[in-house]
Regions:
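Active-site beta-loop-alpha junctions of metal-dependent nucleic acid enzymes
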Residues: 90, 94, 112-134
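RNase H-like two-metal-ion nuclease catalytic core shared by retroviral integrases
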Residues: 55-58, 143-145, 151-154, 167-188, ...
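Conserved, non-catalytic sequence blocks in retroelement Pol enzymes and Pol-derived host proteins
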Residues: 9-11, 25, 74, 91-92, ...
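Short, acidic, Ser/Thr-enriched surface-loop or helix-capping motifs
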Residues: 91, 103-104
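Short glycine-rich loop/turn motifs
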Residues: 94-100
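C-terminal domain-tail junction helix/linker
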Residues: 152, 159-161, 185-247
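Mobile genetic element proteins and their domesticated derivatives, centered on retroelements
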Residues: 1, 19, 35, 39, ...
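Basic, flexible linker segments flanking DNA-binding modules
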Residues: 1-77, 230-239
Length: 247
């Protein structure tokens, strides 16, 4: 277990289930009770430090867009259901706002933009980044009813990308619970462990990008995926299987 924890500075956040998968990947079979006992004895079990809170303010003006997700965050193929939201991080030189887009199929963060403001352009640019990187045409893009997501600019970007917009019910954070779960993970595993209020925004941006695109997407055991495959690995596994079947 110590070897697993030493593989990455983020791995010391591993819980019992992810530790069991990590050991299995190394050919070591261990039961839940044994893992629990060893992790507890060594002080390796951690509880969340804080509870995440919503950030964007909902608007009731846009009523024609319905909730197409309905708390069903599962997807059988990549890029059919996408989730997005904004979170705020206090830094030495101001507040940093992060805007990711997650693919429900694998949990992969397919786009991430960060700025010192939470204006609609932040969300529009995140959507454009996802569209430039992957073929997401035809997907549902789900968010809360914050003014950024109900703005004409964002709705225009949704239409240009060939997406279908879905909005949470007013004041119902559970309608986007999986996205909120990502923010909680990011904060627990990274942001609450570093003094962001003493660090400049540009540095915090680099740390977040490195965590998301080199660890979270590519290395971190993701228990919702078969065999705990990391998000990017699960998507690539699916794509390889499709190529084999098409050959």
């Amino acid at each position: 277990m110590q070897e697993v924890l030493n593989e990455s500075p983020y791995n010391d956040n591993y819980g019992i289930q992810r530790m069991q998968i990590a050991l299995s990947n190394k050919g070591i079979i261990a039961g839940i009770r044994r893992i629990t006992r060893v992790m507890r004895e060594n002080g390796w079990l951690h509880a969340p430090l804080r509870r995440p809170h919503g950030l964007t303010k909902a608007t009731t003006e846009i009523q024609e867009k319905e909730n197409l997700i309905k708390k069903d965050f599962s997807a059988e193929v990549p890029f059919t259901k996408l989730l997005t939201d904004i979170s705020q991080i206090p830094c030495l030189d101001g507040k940093l706002y992060i805007s990711p887009i997650m693919d429900c199929f694998s949990g992969e963060i397919v786009a991430l933009q960060m700025r010192d403001n939470m204006r609609k352009e932040l969300c529009v640019d995140t959507l454009k980044a996802a569209s430039d990187r992957f073929n997401i045409k035809g997907a549902i893009i789900h968010s809360d009813r914050g003014s950024q997501y109900t703005s004409d600019a964002f709705r225009k970007a949704v239409n240009q990308a060939g997406l279908c917009q879905s909005l949470s019910s007013v004041d119902c954070c559970y309608d986007n619970a999986r996205m909120e779960s990502f923010f909680a993970t990011l904060k627990k595993e990274l942001l609450y462990r570093i003094p962001t209020t003493k660090l400049k925004m540009d540095y915090v941006k680099k740390v977040i990008f490195r965590y998301v695109f080199t660890y979270y997407n590519k290395v971190r055991i993701y228990t919702s995926n078969p065999g705990g495959m990391p998000p990017a690995a699960y998507r690539q596994h699916y794509e390889r299987n499709c190529q084999v079947l098409a050959a």
